[in-house]
Curated annotation (Swiss-Prot):
Naturally occurring in which organism (per UniProt): Paenarthrobacter aurescens (strain TC1)
Name assigned to this protein: UDP-N-acetylmuramate--L-alanine ligase
Intrachain disulfide bonds: none
Alphabetically ordered keywords of this record: ATP-binding, Cell cycle, Cell division, Cell shape, Cell wall biogenesis/degradation, Cytoplasm, Ligase, Nucleotide-binding, Peptidoglycan synthesis
Top-level lineage group: Bacteria
Xref: Pfam families: Mur_ligase (PF01225), Mur_ligase_C (PF02875), Mur_ligase_M (PF08245)
Role this protein plays: Cell wall formation.
Length: 456
Protein backbone atom coordinates (compact mmCIF):
# COMPACT_ATOMS: atom_id res chain seq x y z
CA UNK A 1 0.00 0.00 0.00
CA UNK A 2 1.21 3.52 -0.69
CA UNK A 3 0.47 6.59 1.37
CA UNK A 4 -2.22 8.69 -0.21
CA UNK A 5 -3.36 10.81 2.71
CA UNK A 6 -2.14 14.40 2.55
CA UNK A 7 0.20 15.12 5.41
CA UNK A 8 1.66 11.62 5.64
CA UNK A 9 3.71 11.34 2.48
CA UNK A 10 6.07 14.10 3.61
CA UNK A 11 7.01 12.28 6.83
CA UNK A 12 9.10 9.54 5.23
CA UNK A 13 10.09 6.71 7.56
CA UNK A 14 8.63 7.43 11.00
CA UNK A 15 10.22 6.24 14.26
CA UNK A 16 8.18 6.17 17.49
CA UNK A 17 10.03 6.54 20.80
CA UNK A 18 7.75 4.86 23.34
CA UNK A 19 5.71 2.95 20.76
CA UNK A 20 4.19 0.62 23.36
CA UNK A 21 2.02 3.29 24.97
CA UNK A 22 -1.67 3.06 24.18
CA UNK A 23 -1.76 6.46 22.48
CA UNK A 24 1.49 6.01 20.56
CA UNK A 25 0.61 2.51 19.39
CA UNK A 26 -2.72 3.82 18.09
CA UNK A 27 -1.03 6.33 15.79
CA UNK A 28 1.60 3.80 14.72
CA UNK A 29 -1.08 1.23 13.90
CA UNK A 30 -2.91 3.65 11.61
CA UNK A 31 0.29 4.73 9.86
CA UNK A 32 1.29 1.11 9.23
CA UNK A 33 -2.19 0.43 7.82
CA UNK A 34 -1.73 3.33 5.40
CA UNK A 35 1.64 2.13 4.19
CA UNK A 36 3.88 4.51 6.11
CA UNK A 37 7.26 2.87 6.92
CA UNK A 38 7.24 2.68 10.73
CA UNK A 39 9.80 1.70 13.34
CA UNK A 40 9.62 2.08 17.09
CA UNK A 41 11.04 1.21 20.46
CA UNK A 42 10.00 0.94 24.08
CA UNK A 43 11.65 0.00 27.33
CA UNK A 44 9.45 -3.11 27.72
CA UNK A 45 8.40 -5.82 25.27
CA UNK A 46 4.65 -5.24 25.27
CA UNK A 47 2.02 -7.34 23.42
CA UNK A 48 1.03 -4.41 21.20
CA UNK A 49 4.61 -4.22 19.93
CA UNK A 50 4.39 -7.78 18.67
CA UNK A 51 1.13 -6.89 16.92
CA UNK A 52 2.79 -3.93 15.23
CA UNK A 53 5.77 -6.06 14.23
CA UNK A 54 3.44 -8.60 12.63
CA UNK A 55 1.77 -5.75 10.74
CA UNK A 56 5.11 -4.63 9.28
CA UNK A 57 6.67 -2.21 11.77
CA UNK A 58 10.33 -2.58 12.77
CA UNK A 59 10.34 -2.92 16.56
CA UNK A 60 13.16 -2.75 19.13
CA UNK A 61 13.05 -3.38 22.88
CA UNK A 62 15.12 -0.88 24.84
CA UNK A 63 16.30 2.57 23.86
CA UNK A 64 19.42 3.01 21.75
CA UNK A 65 20.46 5.67 19.24
CA UNK A 66 20.98 2.92 16.67
CA UNK A 67 17.24 2.17 16.70
CA UNK A 68 16.61 5.34 14.66
CA UNK A 69 18.10 3.71 11.58
CA UNK A 70 17.15 5.71 8.51
CA UNK A 71 14.16 7.42 10.14
CA UNK A 72 13.22 10.80 8.69
CA UNK A 73 10.62 11.83 11.29
CA UNK A 74 10.51 11.12 15.02
CA UNK A 75 7.41 10.84 17.21
CA UNK A 76 8.10 11.07 20.94
CA UNK A 77 5.63 10.13 23.65
CA UNK A 78 4.84 12.55 26.48
CA UNK A 79 6.58 10.27 28.97
CA UNK A 80 9.90 10.33 27.09
CA UNK A 81 12.54 12.24 29.03
CA UNK A 82 14.83 14.78 27.37
CA UNK A 83 17.90 12.61 28.01
CA UNK A 84 16.47 9.57 26.20
CA UNK A 85 19.33 8.41 23.92
CA UNK A 86 17.09 8.16 20.86
CA UNK A 87 15.61 11.61 21.40
CA UNK A 88 19.09 13.07 21.97
CA UNK A 89 20.37 11.46 18.75
CA UNK A 90 17.36 12.66 16.78
CA UNK A 91 17.84 16.25 17.89
CA UNK A 92 21.57 16.12 17.21
CA UNK A 93 20.80 14.86 13.70
CA UNK A 94 18.33 17.70 13.14
CA UNK A 95 15.41 15.35 12.57
CA UNK A 96 11.89 16.74 13.05
CA UNK A 97 10.41 15.58 16.36
CA UNK A 98 6.62 15.46 16.54
CA UNK A 99 4.35 15.20 19.55
CA UNK A 100 1.98 12.24 19.33
CA UNK A 101 -0.92 14.62 18.68
CA UNK A 102 0.89 16.17 15.71
CA UNK A 103 1.47 12.74 14.21
CA UNK A 104 -2.17 11.83 14.78
CA UNK A 105 -3.28 15.10 13.18
CA UNK A 106 -1.30 14.15 10.07
CA UNK A 107 -3.30 10.92 9.77
CA UNK A 108 -6.56 12.90 9.99
CA UNK A 109 -5.95 14.98 6.85
CA UNK A 110 -8.78 14.69 4.33
CA UNK A 111 -11.27 13.31 6.85
CA UNK A 112 -14.38 14.56 8.63
CA UNK A 113 -12.93 14.60 12.12
CA UNK A 114 -14.83 13.87 15.34
CA UNK A 115 -12.87 14.64 18.49
CA UNK A 116 -13.95 13.85 22.04
CA UNK A 117 -12.53 16.06 24.79
CA UNK A 118 -13.27 16.55 28.46
CA UNK A 119 -11.75 16.10 31.87
CA UNK A 120 -13.42 12.69 32.21
CA UNK A 121 -15.06 10.13 29.95
CA UNK A 122 -13.03 10.70 26.79
CA UNK A 123 -11.96 7.12 26.14
CA UNK A 124 -15.36 5.61 26.85
CA UNK A 125 -17.25 8.16 24.76
CA UNK A 126 -14.79 7.89 21.86
CA UNK A 127 -15.12 4.11 22.05
CA UNK A 128 -18.91 4.36 22.00
CA UNK A 129 -18.82 6.64 18.95
CA UNK A 130 -16.49 4.30 17.05
CA UNK A 131 -18.53 1.18 17.89
CA UNK A 132 -21.81 2.91 17.04
CA UNK A 133 -20.57 4.21 13.67
CA UNK A 134 -19.03 0.87 12.77
CA UNK A 135 -22.26 -0.96 13.61
CA UNK A 136 -24.15 1.61 11.52
CA UNK A 137 -21.97 0.74 8.52
CA UNK A 138 -19.90 3.94 8.36
CA UNK A 139 -16.54 2.19 9.06
CA UNK A 140 -14.60 5.13 10.56
CA UNK A 141 -10.91 5.40 11.22
CA UNK A 142 -10.38 5.76 14.96
CA UNK A 143 -7.71 6.31 17.60
CA UNK A 144 -8.64 5.69 21.23
CA UNK A 145 -6.71 5.81 24.49
CA UNK A 146 -7.96 2.37 25.52
CA UNK A 147 -8.46 -1.04 23.97
CA UNK A 148 -12.07 -1.73 23.05
CA UNK A 149 -13.27 -5.36 23.08
CA UNK A 150 -16.09 -4.69 20.60
CA UNK A 151 -13.52 -3.33 18.13
CA UNK A 152 -10.65 -5.67 18.95
CA UNK A 153 -8.10 -2.84 18.85
CA UNK A 154 -7.56 0.74 20.01
CA UNK A 155 -7.05 2.13 16.50
CA UNK A 156 -7.79 1.26 12.89
CA UNK A 157 -7.82 2.72 9.39
CA UNK A 158 -11.40 2.66 8.13
CA UNK A 159 -12.78 2.86 4.61
CA UNK A 160 -14.93 5.98 5.12
CA UNK A 161 -13.93 9.64 5.33
CA UNK A 162 -14.79 9.79 9.06
CA UNK A 163 -12.05 9.87 11.71
CA UNK A 164 -12.93 9.55 15.41
CA UNK A 165 -10.29 10.42 18.00
CA UNK A 166 -9.85 11.05 21.68
CA UNK A 167 -8.53 14.59 22.25
CA UNK A 168 -6.29 14.85 25.32
CA UNK A 169 -6.29 18.22 27.07
CA UNK A 170 -3.68 17.28 29.69
CA UNK A 171 -0.84 19.13 27.94
CA UNK A 172 -2.82 21.35 25.58
CA UNK A 173 -2.13 19.08 22.60
CA UNK A 174 -5.83 18.76 21.73
CA UNK A 175 -5.42 22.12 20.02
CA UNK A 176 -3.48 20.38 17.21
CA UNK A 177 -6.66 18.86 15.73
CA UNK A 178 -9.16 20.38 13.31
CA UNK A 179 -12.52 18.81 14.14
CA UNK A 180 -15.82 19.09 12.33
CA UNK A 181 -17.63 17.72 15.38
CA UNK A 182 -16.26 18.26 18.88
CA UNK A 183 -17.73 16.57 21.95
CA UNK A 184 -16.96 18.03 25.38
CA UNK A 185 -18.07 15.70 28.16
CA UNK A 186 -17.12 17.99 31.05
CA UNK A 187 -14.66 20.71 32.02
CA UNK A 188 -13.03 20.76 35.45
CA UNK A 189 -9.78 21.95 36.94
CA UNK A 190 -7.18 19.23 36.36
CA UNK A 191 -3.62 18.93 35.09
CA UNK A 192 -2.70 22.03 37.05
CA UNK A 193 0.93 20.87 36.84
CA UNK A 194 0.68 21.97 33.18
CA UNK A 195 -1.89 24.78 33.25
CA UNK A 196 -1.13 26.41 36.57
CA UNK A 197 -4.64 27.71 37.26
CA UNK A 198 -8.24 26.54 36.70
CA UNK A 199 -8.81 29.63 34.56
CA UNK A 200 -6.10 28.47 32.17
CA UNK A 201 -7.82 25.09 31.86
CA UNK A 202 -11.13 26.74 30.96
CA UNK A 203 -9.40 29.04 28.47
CA UNK A 204 -7.85 26.05 26.71
CA UNK A 205 -11.31 24.59 26.12
CA UNK A 206 -12.43 27.92 24.67
CA UNK A 207 -9.51 27.66 22.26
CA UNK A 208 -10.52 24.09 21.45
CA UNK A 209 -14.11 25.08 20.63
CA UNK A 210 -12.81 27.94 18.51
CA UNK A 211 -11.20 25.39 16.17
CA UNK A 212 -14.64 24.38 14.87
CA UNK A 213 -15.65 25.76 11.46
CA UNK A 214 -18.96 27.50 10.80
CA UNK A 215 -20.46 24.25 9.49
CA UNK A 216 -19.17 22.31 12.49
CA UNK A 217 -20.85 21.63 15.82
CA UNK A 218 -19.92 21.63 19.49
CA UNK A 219 -21.74 18.92 21.45
CA UNK A 220 -21.52 19.77 25.15
CA UNK A 221 -22.94 18.04 28.23
CA UNK A 222 -25.54 20.27 29.86
CA UNK A 223 -25.31 18.33 33.14
CA UNK A 224 -21.76 19.57 33.72
CA UNK A 225 -21.33 23.19 34.80
CA UNK A 226 -18.01 23.60 33.00
CA UNK A 227 -19.21 22.14 29.71
CA UNK A 228 -22.45 24.11 29.88
CA UNK A 229 -20.54 27.35 30.46
CA UNK A 230 -18.33 26.50 27.48
CA UNK A 231 -21.43 25.93 25.35
CA UNK A 232 -22.88 29.28 26.40
CA UNK A 233 -19.65 31.15 25.67
CA UNK A 234 -19.25 29.45 22.30
CA UNK A 235 -22.86 30.08 21.31
CA UNK A 236 -22.51 33.77 22.17
CA UNK A 237 -19.69 34.09 19.65
CA UNK A 238 -21.86 32.72 16.84
CA UNK A 239 -18.94 31.11 15.03
CA UNK A 240 -20.25 27.52 15.00
CA UNK A 241 -23.34 25.53 15.94
CA UNK A 242 -23.77 24.42 19.55
CA UNK A 243 -25.92 21.54 20.79
CA UNK A 244 -26.26 20.22 24.32
CA UNK A 245 -27.06 16.77 25.66
CA UNK A 246 -28.03 15.66 29.15
CA UNK A 247 -30.86 15.23 31.64
CA UNK A 248 -31.67 18.94 31.96
CA UNK A 249 -35.01 20.09 30.58
CA UNK A 250 -33.43 22.46 28.07
CA UNK A 251 -30.92 19.99 26.60
CA UNK A 252 -31.18 19.63 22.83
CA UNK A 253 -30.69 15.86 23.14
CA UNK A 254 -32.60 14.94 26.30
CA UNK A 255 -31.45 11.93 28.32
CA UNK A 256 -33.78 9.97 30.57
CA UNK A 257 -31.88 7.77 33.01
CA UNK A 258 -34.09 5.74 35.28
CA UNK A 259 -31.37 3.21 36.01
CA UNK A 260 -30.41 -0.06 34.31
CA UNK A 261 -32.92 -0.98 31.60
CA UNK A 262 -34.61 2.43 31.69
CA UNK A 263 -32.39 4.73 29.61
CA UNK A 264 -33.57 6.68 26.57
CA UNK A 265 -32.87 9.79 24.54
CA UNK A 266 -35.39 12.24 23.13
CA UNK A 267 -34.70 14.18 19.94
CA UNK A 268 -37.06 16.16 17.70
CA UNK A 269 -40.16 14.62 19.26
CA UNK A 270 -38.95 11.03 19.08
CA UNK A 271 -37.89 8.90 22.05
CA UNK A 272 -35.28 6.20 21.51
CA UNK A 273 -34.52 3.52 24.08
CA UNK A 274 -30.85 2.76 24.76
CA UNK A 275 -29.95 -0.83 25.64
CA UNK A 276 -26.69 -0.17 27.49
CA UNK A 277 -24.36 -2.90 28.74
CA UNK A 278 -22.35 -0.51 30.93
CA UNK A 279 -23.62 0.87 34.27
CA UNK A 280 -23.70 4.36 35.73
CA UNK A 281 -25.14 7.80 34.99
CA UNK A 282 -21.80 8.86 33.52
CA UNK A 283 -22.06 6.10 30.91
CA UNK A 284 -25.64 7.06 30.08
CA UNK A 285 -24.39 10.59 29.39
CA UNK A 286 -21.52 9.24 27.31
CA UNK A 287 -24.03 7.21 25.30
CA UNK A 288 -26.15 10.31 24.70
CA UNK A 289 -23.08 12.06 23.31
CA UNK A 290 -22.30 9.15 20.99
CA UNK A 291 -25.93 9.11 19.84
CA UNK A 292 -25.74 12.83 19.05
CA UNK A 293 -22.55 12.39 17.01
CA UNK A 294 -24.08 9.60 14.95
CA UNK A 295 -27.22 11.59 14.18
CA UNK A 296 -25.06 14.55 13.13
CA UNK A 297 -23.28 12.22 10.70
CA UNK A 298 -26.55 11.08 9.16
CA UNK A 299 -27.30 7.89 11.06
CA UNK A 300 -31.03 7.34 11.57
CA UNK A 301 -31.83 7.91 15.29
CA UNK A 302 -33.40 4.50 15.83
CA UNK A 303 -30.41 2.77 14.25
CA UNK A 304 -28.03 4.86 16.34
CA UNK A 305 -29.81 3.90 19.56
CA UNK A 306 -29.83 0.21 18.63
CA UNK A 307 -26.13 0.21 17.71
CA UNK A 308 -25.14 1.36 21.20
CA UNK A 309 -26.21 -2.03 22.51
CA UNK A 310 -23.08 -3.51 20.93
CA UNK A 311 -20.77 -1.49 23.20
CA UNK A 312 -19.49 -3.68 26.02
CA UNK A 313 -16.97 -1.29 27.54
CA UNK A 314 -13.34 -0.23 27.18
CA UNK A 315 -10.27 -1.57 28.90
CA UNK A 316 -9.75 -0.20 32.41
CA UNK A 317 -13.15 1.49 32.35
CA UNK A 318 -15.15 -0.43 34.97
CA UNK A 319 -13.71 -3.59 33.44
CA UNK A 320 -14.65 -6.91 35.02
CA UNK A 321 -11.45 -8.77 35.90
CA UNK A 322 -13.07 -11.88 37.34
CA UNK A 323 -15.05 -13.46 40.16
CA UNK A 324 -14.09 -15.37 43.26
CA UNK A 325 -16.05 -16.49 46.32
CA UNK A 326 -19.10 -14.74 44.87
CA UNK A 327 -17.24 -11.41 44.73
CA UNK A 328 -16.96 -9.48 41.47
CA UNK A 329 -13.68 -7.63 40.91
CA UNK A 330 -13.58 -4.62 38.57
CA UNK A 331 -10.80 -2.28 37.47
CA UNK A 332 -11.12 1.40 36.58
CA UNK A 333 -8.72 4.07 35.32
CA UNK A 334 -10.31 6.85 37.41
CA UNK A 335 -7.68 9.28 38.71
CA UNK A 336 -9.66 12.48 39.42
CA UNK A 337 -12.19 12.83 42.28
CA UNK A 338 -15.13 13.17 39.90
CA UNK A 339 -14.08 10.00 38.08
CA UNK A 340 -13.61 8.10 41.33
CA UNK A 341 -17.07 9.17 42.47
CA UNK A 342 -18.60 8.04 39.14
CA UNK A 343 -16.82 4.67 39.28
CA UNK A 344 -17.95 4.02 42.85
CA UNK A 345 -21.51 5.09 42.01
CA UNK A 346 -21.49 2.54 39.18
CA UNK A 347 -20.14 -0.07 41.60
CA UNK A 348 -22.98 0.74 44.01
CA UNK A 349 -25.55 0.18 41.25
CA UNK A 350 -23.99 -3.21 40.48
CA UNK A 351 -23.59 -4.27 44.13
CA UNK A 352 -27.19 -3.53 45.09
CA UNK A 353 -27.59 -4.20 48.82
CA UNK A 354 -24.09 -5.65 49.10
CA UNK A 355 -20.89 -3.82 49.95
CA UNK A 356 -18.33 -2.01 47.79
CA UNK A 357 -14.61 -2.15 48.57
CA UNK A 358 -12.05 0.00 46.73
CA UNK A 359 -8.27 -0.26 46.42
CA UNK A 360 -7.15 3.19 45.27
CA UNK A 361 -3.76 4.32 44.04
CA UNK A 362 -3.35 8.12 43.81
CA UNK A 363 -1.76 9.27 40.54
CA UNK A 364 0.76 12.15 40.64
CA UNK A 365 1.98 14.06 43.68
CA UNK A 366 0.61 17.34 42.31
CA UNK A 367 -2.90 15.94 41.81
CA UNK A 368 -2.89 14.41 45.30
CA UNK A 369 -1.88 17.76 46.78
CA UNK A 370 -4.60 19.64 44.90
CA UNK A 371 -7.49 17.23 45.49
CA UNK A 372 -6.74 15.23 48.66
CA UNK A 373 -9.97 16.13 50.47
CA UNK A 374 -12.05 15.63 47.32
CA UNK A 375 -10.52 12.18 46.83
CA UNK A 376 -11.37 11.28 50.43
CA UNK A 377 -14.98 12.41 50.01
CA UNK A 378 -15.33 10.33 46.84
CA UNK A 379 -13.68 7.25 48.38
CA UNK A 380 -16.05 7.39 51.34
CA UNK A 381 -18.80 6.26 48.95
CA UNK A 382 -17.26 2.81 49.44
CA UNK A 383 -17.78 0.68 52.51
CA UNK A 384 -14.03 0.09 52.64
CA UNK A 385 -11.36 2.32 51.08
CA UNK A 386 -7.77 1.08 51.04
CA UNK A 387 -5.21 3.55 49.70
CA UNK A 388 -1.80 2.69 48.25
CA UNK A 389 1.22 4.97 47.99
CA UNK A 390 1.19 7.60 45.24
CA UNK A 391 2.09 6.47 41.72
CA UNK A 392 4.54 9.18 40.58
CA UNK A 393 4.42 8.67 36.79
CA UNK A 394 6.39 11.58 35.32
CA UNK A 395 6.78 13.54 38.58
CA UNK A 396 9.45 13.81 41.23
CA UNK A 397 8.26 13.63 44.86
CA UNK A 398 6.91 16.80 46.48
CA UNK A 399 7.97 17.25 50.12
CA UNK A 400 5.11 16.53 52.50
CA UNK A 401 2.83 15.06 49.83
CA UNK A 402 1.89 11.43 50.54
CA UNK A 403 -1.24 9.31 50.48
CA UNK A 404 -1.88 10.23 54.11
CA UNK A 405 -3.21 13.56 52.83
CA UNK A 406 -6.15 11.46 51.63
CA UNK A 407 -6.39 8.82 54.35
CA UNK A 408 -6.37 11.43 57.12
CA UNK A 409 -9.80 12.53 55.85
CA UNK A 410 -11.30 9.07 55.29
CA UNK A 411 -14.15 7.76 57.43
CA UNK A 412 -14.03 4.16 56.18
CA UNK A 413 -10.48 3.69 55.02
CA UNK A 414 -6.78 3.53 55.68
CA UNK A 415 -3.36 3.39 54.08
CA UNK A 416 -2.10 -0.03 52.94
CA UNK A 417 1.29 -1.16 51.72
CA UNK A 418 1.72 -2.94 48.41
CA UNK A 419 2.55 -6.16 50.26
CA UNK A 420 -0.62 -6.23 52.38
CA UNK A 421 -3.09 -4.83 49.83
CA UNK A 422 -4.36 -8.10 48.35
CA UNK A 423 -4.86 -9.80 51.72
CA UNK A 424 -6.54 -6.68 53.11
CA UNK A 425 -9.08 -6.62 50.27
CA UNK A 426 -9.74 -10.36 50.44
CA UNK A 427 -10.31 -10.14 54.20
CA UNK A 428 -13.21 -7.69 53.93
CA UNK A 429 -14.96 -8.96 50.77
CA UNK A 430 -17.95 -11.27 51.17
CA UNK A 431 -20.26 -13.04 48.73
CA UNK A 432 -22.19 -10.55 46.59
CA UNK A 433 -19.79 -7.68 47.24
CA UNK A 434 -17.98 -5.66 44.58
CA UNK A 435 -14.26 -4.91 44.67
CA UNK A 436 -12.87 -2.07 42.56
CA UNK A 437 -9.21 -1.32 41.85
CA UNK A 438 -8.89 2.34 40.89
CA UNK A 439 -6.14 4.55 39.51
CA UNK A 440 -4.08 5.41 36.43
CA UNK A 441 -0.92 3.66 37.61
CA UNK A 442 -0.04 0.00 38.08
CA UNK A 443 -2.90 -0.69 40.50
CA UNK A 444 -4.54 -2.49 37.56
CA UNK A 445 -2.16 -5.41 38.20
CA UNK A 446 -3.84 -6.10 41.55
CA UNK A 447 -7.18 -7.15 40.02
CA UNK A 448 -6.22 -10.63 38.79
CA UNK A 449 -4.25 -11.27 41.99
CA UNK A 450 -7.27 -10.34 44.12
CA UNK A 451 -9.45 -12.67 42.03
CA UNK A 452 -6.94 -15.46 42.66
CA UNK A 453 -6.84 -14.70 46.38
CA UNK A 454 -10.62 -14.99 46.45
CA UNK A 455 -10.39 -18.44 44.89
CA UNK A 456 -11.44 -17.38 41.40
Amino acid sequence: MTTSIAGLESLGRVHFIGIGGVGMSAVARIMVSRGVPVSGSDVKDLPVMRDLSSAGARIAVGYDAGNLGDAQTIVAGSAIRADNPELVAAREAGLPVLHRSEALAATMAGHRVVTVAGTHGKSTTTSMVAVLLKEAGLDPSFAIGANVPALGVNAAHGSSDIFVAEADESDGSFLNYRPLIAVVTNVEADHLDHYGTPEAVFASFDDFAALLPAQGVLLACSDDAGARALADRTASKGTTRVLTYGTSDDADIRLHDGGPGDVSVALDGGVHKLELQVPGRHNALNAAAAFAVAVELGVEPGAAAAALGHFTGASRRFELKGRGRGVRVYDDYAHHPTEVRAALSAARSVAGDNKVHVLFQPHLFSRTREFSQEFAAALDLADTALVLDIYPAREDPIPGVTSTLITDHLVNGRLVSADEAVDAVAAVASEGDVVLTVGAGDVTAYGPVIVEALGG
